[in-house]
Curated annotation (Swiss-Prot):
UniProt source species: Cereibacter sphaeroides (strain ATCC 17025 / ATH 2.4.3) (Rhodobacter sphaeroides)
Disulfide bridge positions per record: none
Any single GO BP term: translation
InterPro entries, sorted: Asn/Gln-tRNA_amidoTrfase_suB/E (IPR017959), Asn/Gln-tRNA_Trfase_suB/E_cat (IPR006075), Asn/Gln_amidotransferase (IPR018027), Asn/Gln_tRNA_amidoTrase-B-like (IPR003789), GatB (IPR004413), GatB_C_1 (IPR042114), GatB_Yqey_C_2 (IPR023168), Gln-tRNA_amidoTrfase_suB_CS (IPR017958)
Designated gene of the protein: gatB
Name the UniProt record assigns to this protein: Aspartyl/glutamyl-tRNA(Asn/Gln) amidotransferase subunit B
GO MF annotation list: asparaginyl-tRNA synthase (glutamine-hydrolyzing) activity; ATP binding; glutaminyl-tRNA synthase (glutamine-hydrolyzing) activity
Function: Allows the formation of correctly charged Asn-tRNA(Asn) or Gln-tRNA(Gln) through the transamidation of misacylated Asp-tRNA(Asn) or Glu-tRNA(Gln) in organisms which lack either or both of asparaginyl-tRNA or glutaminyl-tRNA synthetases. The reaction takes place in the presence of glutamine and ATP through an activated phospho-Asp-tRNA(Asn) or phospho-Glu-tRNA(Gln).
Pfam family, one: GatB_N
Complexes and interactors: Heterotrimer of A, B and C subunits.
Catalytic activity annotation: L-glutamyl-tRNA(Gln) + L-glutamine + ATP + H2O = L-glutaminyl-tRNA(Gln) + L-glutamate + ADP + phosphate + H(+); L-aspartyl-tRNA(Asn) + L-glutamine + ATP + H2O = L-asparaginyl-tRNA(Asn) + L-glutamate + ADP + phosphate + 2 H(+)
Family label: Belongs to the GatB/GatE family. GatB subfamily.
Transmembrane portions of the chain: none
Length: 503
């Protein structure tokens, strides 16, 4: 397999009115666990159900109802940890995070502060060919999601939908290793890609199944290196947390604004206040939500209703044996086995379905040609029509059949595109459609020679020009292909034209 090595990108430098500044970003990603049932109850997790229809007595904190851990959610967290090359903790525990909010019926959230199920891991975030940032994962813990408060249905009333209450979340906490807005968005995209490959979260940001809390601070050049040497976070400046970001574009915009806001405060001699902020995409700015709480503000303590969670190494090993090939490994293999470029490999492995489609087309064929057709023809058409790979009218077998006809010399590249169009709109077997439509390339050298002789005889002036400038021989090739209705084999035409003109 191809061994890919990378250089570390330089941090983003922002020029203030008085000084240069660098960005420091850490992220907490809340990923909804792909599970049919909630973390501590059997209630459904179906999105878009009638309000308060997916709620059990446990979810709405009825007296006497006790939580029971969903083993599948635990397995999904372990699977995620393995996918992020993280330490799996065989003993973890649940804690109560105490705060009042209308959509939190228990009056506390069950989380894992002191003993998370997953420890330190890492994510490699590519920022261009040969350039990547290694982002360290501090921890992954399981916790409950809250419900949804609705304030815009009535001018005098607020409503609460508890369907989301108790749904399992994985909170994936990074170290402050991200150094720019583009890196932050790329980190979320890479994490989402890995989770989708693993099948542990669908990554649907629009539905709120993947949300990001972004911690932003600014420091002077050299301060980050001092932090690395001492692990003293004071070198990184005072951070502000931007909550519940559900768009890559908004994440970048919010970081850009927040960095400028903090720089302006510091250069005016002020101090940045540690707080939680929200991003308003309509105004393109962050605004204060509340002062930033510390762990002690939530009065964490071990949940007395739940025993420590103990798992066996043999079970972890069993999950490890079922792990799929992940994006980085698949990319390296595609480049090594099929000869595709770094860029093409990234495109082809972006989604698991797309990678599987490409591999089905490329197996036993020219990998570069397969990549070209899948990316330019198939993906181009899908994007134009707003379709997913699963909705593609042309199957991998059909596209592979088109490439086989090109390889055998039966059809030209132009014919292949016409054939692809017919398959897209009408379907059918490529070979049968090509035969029925008379889409067969002329490879008979005698017929091609006759056509070349006729074109040369009719254009003596062009012959002299081509002999003086061999590049003009292409004109004859074009005329012959045109005369044969596009059916003449271009390679054969080129060879015969060159021979006839004495080039």
């Amino acid at each position: 397999m191809l061994d890919l090595t990378y250089e570390t990108p330089k941090p983003k430098v922002i020029a203030g009115a008085k000084h240069d500044w660098e960005l420091v970003i850490g992220m907490e990603i809340h990923a909804q666990v792909s599970s049919n049932a909630k973390l501590f109850s059997g209630a459904s997790t179906t999105f878009g159900a009638e309000p308060n229809s997916n709620v059990s007595f446990v979810d709405c904190a009825m007296p006497g109802m006790l939580p029971v851990i969903n083993d599948f959610c635990v397995a999904q967290a372990v699977r995620t940890g393995l996918g992020l090359k993280a330490q799996i903790n065989l003993v973890s525990a649940f804690d109560r995070k105490n705060y009042f909010y209308p959509d939190l019926p228990q009056g506390y959230q069950i989380s894992q502060l002191y003993h998370p199920i997953v420890g330190e891991g890492e994510v490699l975030v590519e920022m261009g060919p040969g350039v990547a940032r290694l982002v360290r994962i501090e921890r992954i813990h399981l916790e409950q999601d809250a419900g949804k408060s609705i304030h815009d249905m009535d001018p005098n009333l607020s409503f609460v939908d508890f369907n989301r209450t108790g749904v399992a979340l994985m909170e994936i906490v990074s170290r402050p290793d991200i150094r720019g807005p583009e890196e932050a968005a790329a980190y979320v995209a890479k994490l989402r890609q890995i989770l989708r490959y693993l099948g542990t979260c669908d990554g649907n940001m629009q539905n709120g199944n993947l949300r990001a809390d972004v911690n932003v601070s600014v420091c002077r050049p050299g301060d980050y290196e001092r932090y690395q040497a001492t692990q003293d976070f004071s070198h990184l400046g005072t951070r502000c947390e931007i909550k519940n970001m559900n768009s890559m574009r908004f994440i970048q915009q919010a970081i850009e604004y927040e960095a400028r806001r903090q720089i302006a405060i510091l250069e005016d001699g002020g101090k940045v206040v540690q707080e939680t902020r929200l991003y308003d995409p309509d105004k393109g700015e962050t605004r204060s939500m509340r002062s930033k709480e510390e762990a002690h503000d939530y009065r964490y303590f071990p949940d007395p209703d739940l025993l420590p969670l103990e798992i066996e190494q043999a079970w972890v090993d069993e999950i490890a044996t079922s792990m799929p090939e992940l994006p980085d490994a698949k990319k390296a293999r595609f480049m090594a086995d099929y000869g595709v470029t770094d860029y093409d490999a990234n495109v082809l492995t972006a989604e698991l379905d797309a990678a599987a489609f490409f591999e089905a087309v490329a197996k036993g064929r020219d990998g570069k040609q397969a990549a070209n057709w899948v990316i330019n023809e198939l993906f181009g058409r899908l994007n134009k029509q707003g379709l997913t790979i699963a909705e593609a009218p042309v199957s991998a077998a059909q596209l592979g059949g088109v490439l086989d006809l090109i390889a055998s010399g039966e059809i030209s590249g132009k014919m292949a595109k016409d054939l692809f169009e017919i398959l897209w709109t009408e379907g059918g077997d490529p070979a049968e459609v090509a035969a029925a439509r008379g889409m067969k390339q002329v490879t008979d050298t005698g017929a091609i020679e006759t056509a070349v002789d006729e074109i040369i005889a009719a254009n003596p002036a062009q012959v002299e020009k081509a002999k003086a400038n061999p590049k003009l021989a292409g004109w004859f090739v074009g005329q012959v292909i045109k005369a044969t209705g596009g059916k003449a084999n271009p390679a054969a035409v080129n060879q015969i034209v060159a021979q006839k003109l004495g080039l």
